[in-house]
Amino acid sequence: MVHGNDVLHHNHFRKKWQFMVKTWFNQPARKERRRQARKAKAQRIAPRPASGPLRPIVNCPTFRYNMKVRSGRGFSLQEVRAAGLNPKFARTIGIAVDHRRRNVSVEGLQRNVARLKAYKAKLILFPLNPAKPQAMDAKADEVKKATQLRRPVLPITQRAKRLKAHKPTSSELRYSAFHAIRQQ
């Protein structure tokens, strides 16, 4: 206990603790700097999409998140070739390619091949030499109408099945999720 009329001490600080304090006074300026950098990059890479290259749809790992899908790093070589593209050429037309990625399911492969084909159908490819256009090059009037895409390229949506409300059956009332998971 305290003896006499002494102060109750609570301040157990280390020496020079003020130098170790982390402050966030630069947060609004950093936010503005990031915004300006995004804007500058969009102007620099125009007329390419501002959000960057097309990325694949991948399933999230682990038991907790495996019902969700998100964008991956890049398409596998198998997916790119199945869509009728050369991996080296695909990188030049705004498709991210990851040579390390492997396809573990046929459904995932088909989903990303369809994504690549949809991208290829919507793509406006500027000719390197307008006098000698290549096979995939766009026409002159399409090139004039082309604008930069500001939002994500082919945005990914969660596939959620909508169920209609119904009266629970006797088997549904007897069902226990805990016991079902424990038995697996």
From Swiss-Prot:
<dbReference type="InterPro" id="IPR001380">
    <property type="entry name" value="Ribosomal_eL13"/>
</dbReference>
<protein>
    <recommendedName>
        <fullName>Large ribosomal subunit protein eL13</fullName>
    </recommendedName>
</protein>
<dbReference type="Pfam" id="PF01294">
    <property type="entry name" value="Ribosomal_L13e"/>
</dbReference>
<dbReference type="GO" id="GO:0003735">
    <property type="term" value="F:structural constituent of ribosome"/>
</dbReference>
<dbReference type="GO" id="GO:0006412">
    <property type="term" value="P:translation"/>
</dbReference>
<dbReference type="GO" id="GO:0022625">
    <property type="term" value="C:cytosolic large ribosomal subunit"/>
</dbReference>
<comment type="similarity">
    <text>Belongs to the eukaryotic ribosomal protein eL13 family.</text>
</comment>
<dbReference type="InterPro" id="IPR018256">
    <property type="entry name" value="Ribosomal_eL13_CS"/>
</dbReference>
<feature type="compositionally biased region" description="Basic residues">
    <location>
        <begin position="31"/>
        <end position="42"/>
    </location>
</feature>
<keyword id="KW-0687">Ribonucleoprotein</keyword>
<feature type="region of interest" description="Disordered">
    <location>
        <begin position="28"/>
        <end position="53"/>
    </location>
</feature>
<dbReference type="GO" id="GO:0003723">
    <property type="term" value="F:RNA binding"/>
</dbReference>
<keyword id="KW-0689">Ribosomal protein</keyword>
